[in-house]
Amino acid sequence: MDAGHTALAMGEMAQAAEHYREATRLDPNLADAWQSLGMALVKLEQLEEAIATLQKLVQLKPRDQLAYSSLSLALGRAGKIKEAEEAAAKAKVAGWGGDPTKLQA
């Protein structure tokens, strides 16, 4: 993770993504690595991979506001507006301390 953060700070987005990708391989349950990878992929405009990555994050942290907000951003950038709105609604519910997994579309 530290190598990814260093690359990110130096503006090396692709290199940062590779470091975060490696962190997810080493520890598939490391939510911070999935979050960082997902957002790096959004910045690289690799939106389909970003969406899949952030969906994994949501699986790991199903009540996390930032996870749903990040997923909403990626979906919106990919033009998947309905799905982005659903993820944004779940982010709001999570922010209020509710259970976004029970929100019906």
What residues fall within each predicted segment?
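Short, charged, intrinsically disordered terminal tails
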Residues: 96-105
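Structural signature of tandem alpha-helical TPR/SEL1-like repeats
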Residues: 9-22, 44-56, 78-90, 95
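TPR alpha-solenoid repeat register
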Residues: 33, 67, 100-101
